[in-house]
């Protein structure tokens, strides 16, 4: 089976030249896949390293998924690089995408490294595709990577077509789906994406991983889809994604 990467046009592919892609083990049907999920790291590379080191399952993890907001505000590529390299020191396979805080050049840098999830479809387990949409819809704060709902709807439609021949779909959207426990701010306002919500309702991926709203850690079903916001890394939130005959999503919190 192919490694978790795509070719130049974003289609799922079984060959590639990126260092990260070549490091990924080839999926074997008899073995469960295990991914560690974290997001909203905001440049705190040492915290990410400490968190990963405290995960009991780290030695057998296939990789780390970073859902967005890799860098600190204004930190750009140097901040993102520190975070990604901290993860790679402990788990060589890392897949990541921008959040709204990350500058556009971070997206290009992730492409250069061959580990980008934003607007990509990759195979990460037998007959299992992961697709990603980073950034967020518009916020009051004018952050660097914000996009209209129509753009998200377009991207998600394209990604679903690329992954159509895979039975199991994993969605990573920095922006949570609208009107869920995962998008509710401290004041009670729901700030998630309608396009992401509609995509989940229509396509019913096995899992929807998100972030963005730090205080909205939680999990709920949207139809049959398990949607999870693990909360910000600063609050100790992360998750385990197990991919075997069943799809299992386990929220975790450091210190809990």
Model-derived regions, located:
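Binuclear metal-dependent phosphoesterase catalytic core
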Residues: 4-16, 123-126, 147, 194-202, ...
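Active-site environment of divalent metal-dependent phosphoester hydrolases
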Residues: 42-46, 71-76, 100-107, 123-124, ...
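Beta-strand-turn-beta hairpins that frame and shape the catalytic cleft
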Residues: 25-36, 122-132, 164-169, 221-226, ...
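Core catalytic region of metal-dependent phosphoesterases/phosphodiesterases
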Residues: 19-22, 38, 44-125
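Conserved catalytic scaffold of divalent metal-dependent phosphoesterases
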Residues: 102-195, 253
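Active-site neighborhood of phospho(di)ester-bond hydrolases with catalytic His/Asp-centered motifs
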Residues: 37-39, 64-69, 94-100, 116-118, ...
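A general structural detector for well-ordered alpha-helical segments in enzyme core domains, enriched
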Residues: 51-54, 79-86, 155, 192-199, ...
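Acidic, histidine-bearing metal-coordination/catalytic regions of metal-dependent phosphoesterases
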Residues: 1-37, 42-46, 59, 246-256
């Amino acid at each position: 089976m192919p490694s978790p990467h795509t070719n130049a046009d974003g289609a799922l592919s079984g060959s590639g030249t990126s260092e990260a892609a070549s490091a990924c083990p080839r999926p074997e049907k008899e073995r469960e896949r295990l991914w560690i999920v974290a997001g909203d790291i905001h440049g705190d590379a040492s915290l990410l390293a400490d968190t990963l080191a405290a995960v009991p399952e780290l030695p057998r993890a296939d990789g780390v998924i970073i859902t967005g907001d890799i860098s600190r505000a204004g930190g750009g590529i140097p901040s993102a690089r520190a975070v990604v390299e901290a993860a790679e020191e402990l788990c060589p396979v890392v897949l990541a995408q921008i959040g709204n805080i990350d500058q556009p050049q971070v997206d290009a840098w992730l492409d250069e490294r061959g580990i980008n999830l934003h607007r990509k479809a990759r195979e990460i387990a037998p007959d299992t595709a992961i697709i990603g949409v980073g950034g967020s819809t518009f916020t009051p704060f004018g952050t660097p990577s914000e996009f209209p709902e129509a753009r998200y709807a377009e991207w998600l439609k394209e990604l679903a077509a690329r992954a159509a021949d895979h039975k199991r779909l994993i969605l990573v959207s920095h922006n949570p789906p609208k009107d869920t426990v995962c998008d509710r701010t401290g004041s009670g306002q729901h700030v998630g994406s309608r396009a992401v919500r509609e995509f989940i309702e229509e396509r019913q991926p096995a899992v929807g991983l998100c972030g963005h709203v730090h205080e909205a850690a939680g999990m709920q079903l949207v139809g049959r889809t398990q949607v999870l916001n693990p909360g910000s890394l600063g609050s100790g939130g992360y998750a385990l994604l197990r991919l075997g005959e069943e799809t299992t999503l386990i929220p975790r919190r450091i210190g809990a």
